[in-house]
Amino acid sequence: MRQSRRKDWIERLLLILLSPLTQAATFDCTIEPGSDDAIGKAHYRIWIPEETPELRGIIFRQHGCGQGARKLGLEHADDIQWQTLAQKHGFALMGSQIWAPEEDCSTWTMPEDGSANAFLSAIKLLARASGHAELDQVPWCLWGHSGGAIWTVNMAYLFPERIIAAFPRSGGLSPAGTTYTRSTPQKPGSNKATLKVPILFCYGKEEYQSGNRFYDLIAGVHEVFEFGRKHHAPWALAVHPDSEHENSQSRQLAIRYFDKIIPARLPDPAHPKNKIQVLKTLPTGKHWIGLHESLETFEASNLQSNLHKSSYLLNKTLATDWESFCQNGHIPDTSPPTPPHNLRVEQEQYRTKLQWNAYADMESGIQSFRIYRKGKLIGEIAGVLNRQWNPTGAYQAWNYSDQPLHGRELLPMVFTDGNAANAQPEDYHVSTVNKEGLESKRTQGISMKTWSVRNKSVWTNLSDTDFLTHWEGP
């Protein structure tokens, strides 16, 4: 990119980022492989939450092996439920799409073969592009599925000082007995600092049955997990009942896990800028323990031996969530979702158009939106039925790889009332219903004209730049 064009682009970008009503923003970039790298091209997407002047971390979600998982890998950054987690803690959310020569994903599951450098290079590029220079310094939460789980655990051994916590779903350092022609997996005892990093390993119960094609993969999980627990690592293991290699409902546990660990690990917000943040060590002696055989949970002071058959759980709340998930594959959500916001009402003769914004329920996502006029339910906005992945027709759903279902854009948060005689903007209300069936408080409408006056903002398309796209949205 020519220097003059870059300067102009940065100035335009700063105008947006310094606007008092900064919207959520998404950036994409591509990293070309180096001459010594085994991987192909690596694409990355990062989502920056609204009204977050300084980011405190990155939640990075690494897809698994194969064309199907890679195809929608970038959409990990578009998942509205994970975005709610990121927004809550002032984090960016990031996904990837890594190409493997001849579909050999071992070219990238070993970070030292090029995928670690690609990840770090992408962060530098996206930090500059987004105007959030701190991205190059903030710590990470890593989530990975299958091959992405292998990558995640190996990254925990290579960069323990940067990792707040990790959630590998169906993967350890490597499948048991596997050999590699290039870089080799890290050894369980190769980096003592990793034994301070909180990790929650998770896999489907059916995977660890004799004869299952993923048996060796899960045997590798047990190798690293049991070594770590014997050395008092703050690690946990959750076996997902009635599940195999698919993610199913494991996000219920993963999101709650990160939500509890992030504040326990992050340093004081007043920490000096432009330095790698020193993460806090999780407490010992005040945590909870989960026994793998009985699924009983209790305070840690009651357990003195057989640590490798138990899980470290930060507190009673997380212990309860772990127990429920391991027993039922589901964690109940007893709190209603956050109400929608910015309900704009635009009237045209006898037709009225409603538009709104909403955050997903962090624990259980969005089932639907309910629309009311003068207190009467007049409509509901939900999603598209899918027999396998969305049998209830929820507004928001996910696939085998825990990516937004089919990469579809969510249905717009829009409703048109064609029978609106004598209705005023304040007569309309909208609520959010989560997947537990709990309904939020209702948000009252405001006229589009009034809303527009209150919320002037700048929208700029930078998609003509050489190496990334940028767009803004609610």
Where are these regions (language model features)?
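Pro/Thr/Ser/Gly-rich low-complexity, intrinsically disordered linker/stalk tracts
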Residues: 328-365, 440-473
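Alpha/beta-hydrolase-fold serine-hydrolase catalytic core, especially in secreted/extracellular enzymes
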Residues: 241-341
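Alpha/beta-hydrolase active-site loop
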Residues: 108-132
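The feature captures the conserved acid-bearing segment of alpha/beta-hydrolase catalytic domains
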Residues: 164-165, 170-251
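Beta-strand-rich modules
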Residues: 417-436
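Recognizes extended acidic, P/S/T-rich segments that occur
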Residues: 368-423
